[in-house]
């Protein structure tokens, strides 16, 4: 079947290798993207040859099914960056967001210090409008290049895109994010702030275990982690999955967790908080075996 594709694909690639949860069965088809031109070829093909597909980056916000994915998984590994001016930088979407924040802050640029603790790609950060209590991706974004559903490369200025808390227009109208351009400022204190952010995250979050980061979005004015803590759920374990004792909004893989373990913990948290009149909405992407 792979011979029918006009580009190279792999079969039966374990998705656990591409998930920070370390959970997931095999992808029926798997394609690594390493350039924008390659992505254009792939999406032009998909426009005329419908096939279920998903796009992944670092897999830091995904929970794959134990059966895997019955379709094509596109792994975005398109990396690179260039300064368009002294304080504007264009970054390809498969680049590490955390590494970008670290490098820029160490060079005296402010605007993306918060990225140092976000273990995903630039494309994933734009898609989720990733951020912290201090800032989010849209705060310094000035332009996004996308490949639309018909395989055409488009450049969209920030003012034409509507972002909100952990939400971008690309969640409702899927497109492949090819690059993002950010506006920076020069600030010699940027590295100090980035270092403090990393130290705080290491102290408060369970980096020693595989996880997908925060499972739930924070309700307005509230902390999901604090709510889960107050509900007495921290430390609850099902199979190999556990609600972190360090941070209530993290579910960790203690070694042999399966998808069902994580989903059951998510359901317990949601039902428990619902009884208190609080609705928690998932931040993590649950990717089923079949779309």
From Swiss-Prot:
Residues the record marks as active site:
166, 214 (proton donor), 283
Q: Where in the cell is it found?
A: Cytoplasm
* EC nos: 1.3.1.98
Q: Which reaction does it catalyse?
A: UDP-N-acetyl-alpha-D-muramate + NADP(+) = UDP-N-acetyl-3-O-(1-carboxyvinyl)-alpha-D-glucosamine + NADPH + H(+)
To which pathway does this protein belong?
Answer: Cell wall biogenesis; peptidoglycan biosynthesis
Q: Where is the FAD-binding PCMH-type domain?
A: 22-187
Q: Name one GO molecular function term.
A: UDP-N-acetylmuramate dehydrogenase activity
Question: Could you give one GO CC term from the UniProt record?
Answer: cytosol
> Which cofactors?
FAD
- Family, per entry: Belongs to the MurB family.
Function of the protein: Cell wall formation.
Protein name (database record): UDP-N-acetylenolpyruvoylglucosamine reductase
This protein's species is: Chlamydia trachomatis serovar A (strain ATCC VR-571B / DSM 19440 / HAR-13)
- Gene field: murB
């Amino acid at each position: 079947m792979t011979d029918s594709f006009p580009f190279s694909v792999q079969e039966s690639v374990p998705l656990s290798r591409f998930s920070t949860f370390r959970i997931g069965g095999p992808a029926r088809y798997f394609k690594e993207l390493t350039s924008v031109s390659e992505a254009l070829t792939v999406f032009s093909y998909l426009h005329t040859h419908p096939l279920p597909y998903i796009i992944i980056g670092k897999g830091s916000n995904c929970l794959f099914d134990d059966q895997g994915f019955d379709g094509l998984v596109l792994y975005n590994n398109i990396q690179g960056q260039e300064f368009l001016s002294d304080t504007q930088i264009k970054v390809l979407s498969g680049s590490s967001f955390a590494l970008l924040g670290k490098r820029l802050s160490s060079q005296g640029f402010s605007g993306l210090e918060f990225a140092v603790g976000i273990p995903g790609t630039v494309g994933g950060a734009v898609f989720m409008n990733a951020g912290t209590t201090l800032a989010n991706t849209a705060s310094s974004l000035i332009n996004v290049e996308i490949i639309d559903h018909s395989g055409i490369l488009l450049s969209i200025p920030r003012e034409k895109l509507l972002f909100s808390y952990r939400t971008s227009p690309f969640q409702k109208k899927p497109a492949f994010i090819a690059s993002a351009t950010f506006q920076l400022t020069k600030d010699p204190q940027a590295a100090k702030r980035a270092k403090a952010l990393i130290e705080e995250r290491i102290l408060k979050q369970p980096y020693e275990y595989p996880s997908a980061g925060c499972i739930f979005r924070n309700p307005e004015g509230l902390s999901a982690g604090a709510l889960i803590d107050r509900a007495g759920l921290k430390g609850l374990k099902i199979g190999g999955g556990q609600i972190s004792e360090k941070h209530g909004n993290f579910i960790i893989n203690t070694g042999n967790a399966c998808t069902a373990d994580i989903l059951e913990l998510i359901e317990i948290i949601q039902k428990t908080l619902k009884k208190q009149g609080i609705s928690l909405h998932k931040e993590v992407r649950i990717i089923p075996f079949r779309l």
